[in-house]
């Protein structure tokens, strides 16, 4: 199946006074998987509330740091500013790391949390913010990271409590097979036995970034200097790998479907 998207300037109207809650597992996920979408929402006047579950303590820094959690929180704040996020909320759980790591047994690890309780907390936030939609991950957490799977469960539970439309962030594995280098190349190698993303036919909604949105996404990714090599962002294949963002929608058409060159596929 071939997906053709109009990459010209979107024509949708303003979204002033409307809100979406975007849930991610670690700092940098917001930029990599939803950066262009968040930037477009903000540019159209929507209020974007970014919720990040952990500080990404188990991410391997590219250089020596004294407090990786503090560094990554600061990077997240800079990235959120680049993307136009109106409010940043940290759930305060600890990065669980990967299967087999001792960190998964840490009492504060996201994997050890009561996910229903976290979902209830998120639902209260959704109601307080009067958000119309919740963005989370697909059922496999895009590439099988345990924290991403947990975030999927938390997001779906909160959406179920509030009756909101859910957009499950994912990637199109058929597209990325032919695209340039992507951070998922290394991520999937660290999680064995998992196929990343979805095939094109499973994706319901896709957004093509405009040049300005892609530039904002690149800047947001660049803010995460402890994790992302700036040279990767200068790769000639950057646009091929990152200009599209994909979702599986659960529920009626909602806010993300009103963003212009977003195409509903099913």
Predicted region positions:
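Active-site rim/loop-helix segments in enzyme catalytic domains that contact anionic ligands
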Residues: 1-129, 157, 248, 254, ...
